Regions:
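Rossmann-fold NAD(P)-binding glycine/threonine-rich loop
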Residues: 134-167, 172, 182
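Internal alpha-helical scaffold of NAD(P)-dependent oxidoreductase catalytic cores
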Residues: 93, 160-166, 184-224, 228-229, ...
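Rossmann-like NAD(P)-binding element
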Residues: 87-89, 95-129, 134-140
Length: 249
């Protein structure tokens, strides 16, 4: 099937991306105890907090790649169709269950809810890799969005979610692109990634590949503002080559 061929192609590309990220971020090797094997063949347990359009769409792509997914909502019974579509390795639960379940936690909530996620589930996520894809919109999220955009969303999210291995990713493309452009023919759509923890960045890199996209490592969390909403690379459907050129990488 053509999707599996593209997936194999993306897997081959991962070693090149990981080498580049390790070289750029540190001269020391990246050691991924417990998760290193998952990057070759083992499925990861991923808890998704916020299973709406983007959380649900990305979760489906990860389920297709063989990962175990716990979609969550305050009304998990409403996620039955999503779980059925995702297959036998997926289930639904409450956000607390997702925070407990996941080796990786994907936070896909309206940005104004991010501080509450930290307050409610931060203790359960301590030391875990957390991928944050929320975007602050002033019209929807109010003054806190303006503050987050001024700081850069990576820096702001780190304040809301202390003690986790935070990565910013999956915020700079739409849920429509996730559904329609994953594993497409030719050059894949790029997804920018920013994070301070090398292990977390490496795992997020693999998860971008698993979802059917091309990872572009931009730098630490202080660089995540380069792909915040309103920037030149936000929801532009760029290839990795185009994105690197735009960002000067």
């Amino acid at each position: 099937m053509k999707n599996s061929n593209r997936f194999s192609y993306s897997r081959r590309k991962f070693s090149r991306h990981l080498f580049i990220s390790a070289t750029a971020m540190s001269a020391a090797p990246i050691l991924l105890p417990g998760i290193a094997q998952a990057q070759s063949s083992t499925s990861l347990k991923i808890g998704i907090i916020g299973s709406g359009r983007i959380g649900g769409s990305v979760g489906l792509r990860w389920a297709e790649a063989g990962h175990e997914i716990l979609f969550s909502s305050r009304n998990p019974d409403q996620l039955n169709d999503l779980v059925t579509q995702a297959g036998p390795k997926a289930r639904a639960g409450y956000p607390q269950e997702a925070a407990e379940f996941g080796d990786i936690v994907f936070v896909a909530v309206p940005y104004a809810a991010t501080p509450q996620v930290g307050r409610d589930y931060g203790a359960l996520m301590q030391g875990k890799i957390v991928i944050d894809c929320g975007n602050p919109y002033i019209q929807r999220d109010g003054e806190m969005a303006a503050v987050a955009l001024e700081k850069g969303t990576g820096v702001a999210s780190a304040e809301f979610l202390p003690g986790v291995k935070l990565v910013r990713a999956f915020n700079a493309l739409s849920w429509v692109e996730v559904n329609e452009e994953a594993h497409r023919d030719g050059e894949l759509i790029a997804i920018p990634i920013a994070g301070d923890d090398q292990e977390a960045v490496a795992v997020a890199t693999q998860l971008v590949i698993d979802a059917g996209f091309d990872p572009v490592i931009v730098g630490g969390l202080d660089k995540a503002g380069l792909f915040d909403q309103g920037t030149a690379v936000y929801v532009k459907g760029m290839t990795a080559r185009e994105m690197r050129a735009e960002l000067g990488l």
